[in-house]
């Protein structure tokens, strides 16, 4: 069972601690742009005692996507896009993982053990999932469903940042553009970025 000092309880959140996520709507109700920032923050509720790791470790890339929220906010402003961002560390639950993933609640992160997650109980996992993960994704679905009902085909831009070195591998890329099947947005974007700077590795 997880150490009691790390156990999450919504009732123990301080009045000064934020909701699990922040939503910014668009001034243009028919804007096609939808920006997400899953790993915007490295905040941990005070009663969870930083999950048992140091502040130095939490401030590394393992705790959040450094700089991602600033980019997401600026992009949202430029595009007049809706924005939803997570308000707590990815080490509590990873909003960019399915709940079945072994890294959904990581026991280690880039070589750093996360004591609060090593012997986590099913009850604790459920509490965290409902509070931090479920409502975040339900709100995304509701927003997208509303747009589609209004005849708007949304373009989702998920903002992340990545560390130049991960697990002793030096990543050569300046920018990563990930997509699943639909290339209508990502290929023109790649071409435009390379047009502006042909030295970029994408």
Regions found by a protein language model. Give the residues of each.
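N-terminal catalytic or cofactor-binding beta/alpha core of small enzyme domains
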Residues: 2-156, 161-202
């Amino acid at each position: 069972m997880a150490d009691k000092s790390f156990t999450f309880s919504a009732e123990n959140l301080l009045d000064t601690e934020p909701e699990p996520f922040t939503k910014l709507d668009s001034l243009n109700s028919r804007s096609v742009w939808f920006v997400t920032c899953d790993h915007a923050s490295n905040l941990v509720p005070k009663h969870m005692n930083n999950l048992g790791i140091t502040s130095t470790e939490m401030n590394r890339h393992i705790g959040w996507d450094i700089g991602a929220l600033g980019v997401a906010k600026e992009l949202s402003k430029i595009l007049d896009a809706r924005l939803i961002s997570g308000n707590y560390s990815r080490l509590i639950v990873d909003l960019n993982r399915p709940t079945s993933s072994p890294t959904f609640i990581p026991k280690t992160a880039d070589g750093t053990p996360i004591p609060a997650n090593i012997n986590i109980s099913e009850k604790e996992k459920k509490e965290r999932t409902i509070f931090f993960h479920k409502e975040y994704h339900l709100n995304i679905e509701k927003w997208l469903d509303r747009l589609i009902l209004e005849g708007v085909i949304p373009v989702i831009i998920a903002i992340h940042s990545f560390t130049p070195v991960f697990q002793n591998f030096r990543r050569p890329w300046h920018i990563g553009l990930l997509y699943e099947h639909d290339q209508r947005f990502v290929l023109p974007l790649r071409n435009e970025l390379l047009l502006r700077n042909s030295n970029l590795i994408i």
